[in-house]
UniProtKB/Swiss-Prot annotation:
Binding-site residues, substrate: 45, 66, 258
Keywords associated with the record: Cytoplasm, NAD, Oxidoreductase, Pyridoxine biosynthesis
Protein name: Erythronate-4-phosphate dehydrogenase
One GO BP annotation of this record: 'de novo' pyridoxal 5'-phosphate biosynthetic process
The family this protein is said to belong to: Belongs to the D-isomer specific 2-hydroxyacid dehydrogenase family. PdxB subfamily.
Catalytic activity: 4-phospho-D-erythronate + NAD(+) = (R)-3-hydroxy-2-oxo-4-phosphooxybutanoate + NADH + H(+)
Example of a GO cellular component annotation carried by this entry: cytosol
Active-site residues, as the UniProt record annotates them: 208, 237, 254
């Protein structure tokens, strides 16, 4: 059995070798000749999986180690009798922590407290729910917009997008990309929406590039609209609008979900799905794969305020480490993908062990996802 895996899927070689012969290949472009005798294909979001790629090939199963699936023609796979699995929620924690890193940086730079801001979350799935929970643990007001969930009657106080635009100081998008249909998200943030944002608002897109109309956004920024912008995703990736990058406050190369934990979850989820598909079901404990964190332990004295939280968050991950490299190489062919391929190891907050002498600080840090314990001062 021959299994092709994306060369940038951590632990893929070791795991899938339990099931067959493994060949690691680049995801963009994928070497088509390798598909001629392969039984399974494991990809990431950079690989377009459709009829033109797989027609006439012996592939029986496709797995994507990503939460999103807009790069996969699921309907054609089903029609062709090819098994499929994604990894929903695998990088949700990573994306939430990317948003926090960005907001805490902007808050420090511009001198505001997040408690004074209302955060509008568009898309309340794996990412949106976790973001809401962490923000509310800090006492920060959130407004939720998710029409599909609202129409299904899911639990939640869902508002219209217009209401979020009117009342939110921070608007962050966490939706799939739907190009048509009743829940279309293509250019959900169009010129009208962008112009309607509150003066000084923060706009964040860490889902799919085309959810925000990049041309319209650049037009508004060029005209002097008072707006802070965080973009991790771009229309036309791996190409991006260099002029737009120059205007945004934070710009990164589609790496919001790129923690080691998130990548490992994606790999293990599709591994487990494929093992079940071929009748050799196996399960993997994530902590048996991950290395020891870079940080040992730190001690925190007193309560948890915003500056302290910012220091802890940026000790684990400071978004500026990914903004600067993109600006240096933007517009150079191949460099966007190279940044992603050679991405520095990044961990999640849970990798940081924090000893607190304040019980409320320890409790709050645990709610936020840190590995915190309370040890009273002697």
């Amino acid at each position: 059995m021959k299994i092709l895996v994306d060369e940038n899927m951590p632990y893929a070689r070791d795991l899938f070798s339990r099931l067959g012969e493994v060949t690691a290949v680049p995801g963009r472009p994928i070497p088509v000749a390798q598909l001629a005798d392969a039984d399974a294909l494991m990809v990431r979001s950079v690989t377009k999986v459709n009829e033109s790629l797989l027609a006439g090939k012996p592939i029986k199963f496709v797995g994507t180690a990503t939460a999103g699936t807009d790069h996969v023609d699921e309907a054609w796979l089903k029609q062709a009798g090819i098994g499929f699995s994604a990894a929903p929620g695998c990088n949700a924690i990573a994306v939430v922590e990317y948003v926090f890193s960005s907001l805490l940086m902007l808050a420090e730079r511009d001198g505001f407290s997040l408690h004074e801001r209302t955060v509008g979350i568009v898309g309340v799935g794996n990412v949106g729910r976790r973001l809401q929970a962490r923000l509310e643990a800090l006492g920060i007001k959130t407004l939720l917009c998710d029409p599909p969930r609202a129409d299904r009657g899911d639990e939640g106080d869902f508002r219209s997008l217009d209401e979020l635009v009117q009342h939110a100081d921070i608007l962050t998008f966490h939706t799939p990309l739907f190009k048509d249909g009743p829940y279309k998200t293509l250019h959900l943030a169009d010129e009208k929406l962008i112009r309607s944002l509150k003066p000084g608002a923060i706009l964040i897109n860490a889902c799919r590039g085309a959810v925000v109309d990049n041309t319209a956004l650049l037009t508004c920024l060029n005209e002097g609209q008072k707006l802070s912008v965080v973009l991790d995703v771009w229309e036309g990736e791996p190409e991006l609008n260099v002029e737009l990058l120059k205007k945004v406050d934070i710009g990164t190369p589609h790496i919001a979900g790129y923690t080691l934990e998130g990548k490992a979850r994606g790999t293990t989820q599709v591994f487990e799905a494929y093992s079940k598909f071929i009748g050799h079901e196996q399960h993997v404990a994530l902590d048996t794969l991950l290395p020891a964190p870079e940080f040992g332990r730190i001690t925190l004295h007193g309560p948890l305020d915003q500056p302290t939280l910012k220091r802890l968050v940026h000790l684990v991950y400071d978004v500026r480490r990914d903004d600067a490299p993109l600006r240096k190489v933007a517009g150079i062919p191949g460099e966007f993908d190279k940044l992603r391929k050679n991405y520095l190891e990044r961990r999640e907050w849970s990798s940081l062990y924090v000893i607190c002498d304040d019980a409320s600080a320890a409790s709050l840090l645990c709610k936020l996802g840190f590995n915190a314990v309370h040890h009273p001062a002697r």
